[in-house]
Amino acid sequence: MNTATKLLRGGVRAYQLTLSSVLGGQCRFYPSCSAYAMEALAVHGALHGSALAARRILRCHPWNPGGVDPVPPAHHHDEMKQNG
């Protein structure tokens, strides 16, 4: 895991330990958006993991029903690049 990924994961962890506990379980998805971000960063790295996390956070609003939304596997991104 590179330095950028570690820093981003540290930021998410800080959010989990501070604001998340104050705001309560508001996420409409499983896993929660912050847990999704942690996993996306670990699996896909800083750049692609951040993009996946941002996309997830933008979908977390009252007009989206939510539900189960796992982080795509690492090979999924590679296949998308190959298939254009």
Curated annotation (Swiss-Prot):
Membrane-protein topology: Peripheral membrane protein
UniProtKB keywords: Cell inner membrane, Cell membrane, Membrane
Keyword presence, DNA repair: no
InterPro entries: Membr_insert_effic_factor_YidD (IPR002696)
Localization: Cell inner membrane
GO cellular component: plasma membrane
Function: Could be involved in insertion of integral membrane proteins into the membrane.
Family: Belongs to the UPF0161 family.
Name of the molecule in the record: Putative membrane protein insertion efficiency factor
Organism lineage string: Bacteria, Pseudomonadati, Pseudomonadota, Alphaproteobacteria, Acetobacterales
